[in-house]
Amino acid sequence: MHFYRTNEFRVGLKIMLNGEPYAIIENEFVKPGKGQPFNRVRLRQLLSGKKIIEKIFKSGDAVEAADIIDRHLNYLYNNGEFWYFINNQNYELVAADAKAVGDYAKWLVKQTPCVLTLWKDQPIAVVPPNFVELEVLSTDPGIKGDAISSIYKPATLTTGVIVKVPLFINKGEIIKVDTRTSMYISRVK
């Protein structure tokens, strides 16, 4: 069992707290005028991915390291219940349930490289790449001269997600989208 001391805390470090894995998303070392120095840490619960807590650790405290593994795999297919990912080196399949995939299911297209976070050999989180290229299935037609406008219109992409795109984007075009913000980035040539 490995432990991290507070002076080893870094953003992205994964630790165990109350029997559950957490990731450090913010770490601030505070040395008050009086009293003992401490670390004010913001943590994201990895099982749900949504719960964020703030905790204070005294300087020199030790916390158990989480046995978390991040694996780079490619998305293969979905059978309605599980999303399947493949390791292209040894062709091993890993199945992730809807809880692990979460809202990111809308960005998964065949052969999309993803990062699967495993805890106790079970997927607890799936993270798609920051940018994906998807085809526009439907949108209002563009009008000549719309290239210099900052007005956006809704467009439905191949995965069913709806994003706002500039007026010059037409049906059938491939666009680059930021998966973290669901925002249009550029048109793919």
Curated annotation (Swiss-Prot):
Gene3D superfamilies: 2.30.30.30, Nucleic acid-binding proteins. GO terms for cellular component: cytoplasm. May be beta-lysylated on the epsilon-amino group of Lys-34 by the combined action of EpmA and EpmB, and then hydroxylated on the C5 position of the same residue by EpmC (if this protein is present). Lysylation is critical for the stimulatory effect of EF-P on peptide-bond formation. The lysylation moiety may extend toward the peptidyltransferase center and stabilize the terminal 3-CCA end of the tRNA. Hydroxylation of the C5 position on Lys-34 may allow additional potential stabilizing hydrogen-bond interactions with the P-tRNA. The modification N6-(3,6-diaminohexanoyl)-5-hydroxylysine is found at residue 34. Coiled coil: none annotated. The keyword Protein biosynthesis applies. The keyword Electron transport does not apply. GO terms for biological process: peptide biosynthetic process. Pfam families: EFP, EFP_N, Elong-fact-P_C. Pathway: Protein biosynthesis; polypeptide chain elongation. GO terms for molecular function: translation elongation factor activity. Keywords: Cytoplasm, Elongation factor, Hydroxylation, Protein biosynthesis. InterPro entries: Elong-fact-P_C, NA-bd_OB-fold, Rib_uL2_dom2, Transl_elong_fac_P/YeiP, Transl_elong_KOW-like, Transl_elong_P/YeiP_cen, Transl_elong_P/YeiP_CS, Transl_elongation_fac_P. It is found in: Cytoplasm. Belongs to the elongation factor P family. Involved in peptide bond synthesis. Alleviates ribosome stalling that occurs when 3 or more consecutive Pro residues or the sequence PPG is present in a protein, possibly by augmenting the peptidyl transferase activity of the ribosome. Modification of Lys-34 is required for alleviation. This is Elongation factor P. It comes from Baumannia cicadellinicola subsp. Homalodisca coagulata.
